[in-house]
Amino acid sequence: MRKIILASGSPRRKELLELASVPFEIIVSEVEETIGAYSSPSDIVMSLALQKASAVAEYNSDHIVLGADTIVTYESRILGKPSNEAEAKEMLQLLSGKTHEVYTGVAIIAKDKTVTFYERTEVTFWELTEEEIDAYIALKEPLDKAGSYGIQGKGSIFVQHIQGDYYSVVGLPISRLVRELKQFNIDVTHA
């Protein structure tokens, strides 16, 4: 059986694959995450996911390679990972009391087939006080996450409502991924 390789160092993506009993290895893609001129957030995440998977698949062509990327958008503004605490605070203030979208794109590459897809989830935040934001940033949790929060961590206390796939917001739409893997003769639903 061909190995599945996760082209990501994300501990959250690793945990989600383990949760679904997907057997895999990790080879971190060294692709620089730069957002070029794309027409939509879905194009951005699918393109970045494909770039990451392609970089690893180039040297692992006998296996199935998964790449993924997540971004947060608010009113056409893309919120990636903050570069510092001040930017994290600005993002959280922007999202406070509002609904934003989280896009996660996935690419699955094998020698004979490539599949890309994305999931879009709406997340609504409660109104956040400056004290709440400052305390959260002090934890350092938001500094490596798109939109400056982790819904699976302490950032969960900011979420008033979610519409869509929770796991996509975490970083990998695992339910859809498991279904897409069936196209590659990988079925973990009976494992």
Swiss-Prot record:
EC assignment: 3.6.1.9
Pfam family, one: Maf
Site positions (Important for substrate specificity): 12, 70, 152
List of catalytic residues: 69 (proton acceptor)
GO cellular component, one term: cytoplasm
Annotated localization: Cytoplasm
Cofactor: a divalent metal cation
Family, per entry: Belongs to the Maf family. YhdE subfamily.
The protein's name in its UniProt record: dTTP/UTP pyrophosphatase
Species: Bacillus cereus (strain Q1)
